Amino acid sequence: MTRAEYQAQKAMKARMRQTEQKHTQAAKGSMDLPFLILTLLLTVIGLIMLFSASFPRAYYDTGDGTYYFKRQALFAVIGLAGMFVVGKINYQRWRGASRMLVGLALFLLILVIIPHNPLAITANNATRWLGIKGVFQFQPSEIAKLAVIVYFSDTISKKKEKMLTWRQGIVPYVALLGIISVLMMLEPHLSGTVLILCTGAVLMIVGGIQGWLVAAGIGGVGTIGLLFVKLAESGVIKYGSARIAMWHDPWLDYSGDGYQLAQSLITIGSGGLLGVGLGRSRQKFLYLPEQYNDFIFSVVCEELGLIGACVIMLIFALLILRGFWIALHARDRFGALLVVGIMTHLALQTFLNIAVVSGFVPTTGISLPFFSYGGTALCLQLVEMGMVLSVSRQIPAPKAG
């Protein structure tokens, strides 16, 4: 590097620091009201539906029908408090935490797959959780998701035209996604891996990666996915093979591997157009597995019917669209990418959960944001909404005239 190039790079870094300080010290406006209202609405509806869906299971497990609801409500309060606190903090501060988040995520992902680890929790033939069972537990993949979003947004926003190069625009991001994907597949956690890969890919695309590389990447991922499905169907890959077979026709083994999906379809169909009424689901009485977790949307369809389910999907759609509107109007590139990453992940997770319970894609462990039982997941979702609200507070005011 020549002296002139060094001086130019030094001057550019100084300008970036000045810009960041300016944004940090800038007077903040109010939070985006439509986004805030939609977030609160989904949180409240989610708690109501969780109370209804979880009552029989909670009574069967603990003797207290409100057990799961009370725990979720407590985490909702904590999460909402966190959302408002994060919404008040300037989102630029997350830049400094991006590398620390990646390091923490990798450490936790390695920790969860260590054999005979007393802190690792196994359920449904997958070891995805850390903590003390029945007291406190969380999925390291949730931390990994946030780490990828913040790190990608931070580094991509600084590179700009360098995103067109292999060395700086492709290799470091693909390498990180590859490491995280391998660690998550060892749990195994296929759905979480797909979500993180897709979110990372979208951020790279928005960040300026070349179109032909995107097409090649999508083609490669599609080929690998198709190969996995074919190998699972043939029985070569044991993990997921039964799920894929039952996805084609759950009635082939109704009392075995096809039971969960078959019950989900029965639950959805039982609701009809208007539903059986809030709290009146019959399938939640231990017929439908995971009725308060991954398959809670089936209970929503049964109790509220097609119309109620469509209203909830509309609220999700409005929240996601409003989030992307905030991204389009963000003050800077980092804020825009941060919101795009958060909303992309939310959109994909919501779509995949509904697709799973409806039988459009093979059954896999993926929760419905704001609805499924899981305190730490809900807290992190609300904190992410707080990050979006923080970006919305610094949207430049429209010029008069």
Where are these regions (language model features)?
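Hydrophobic alpha-helical transmembrane segments
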Residues: 74-79, 303-323
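Hydrophobic alpha-helical segments of polytopic membrane proteins
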Residues: 77-79, 99-106, 167-185, 190-232
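Alpha-helical transmembrane segments of multi-pass membrane proteins, especially transporters
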Residues: 168-173, 196, 217, 247, ...
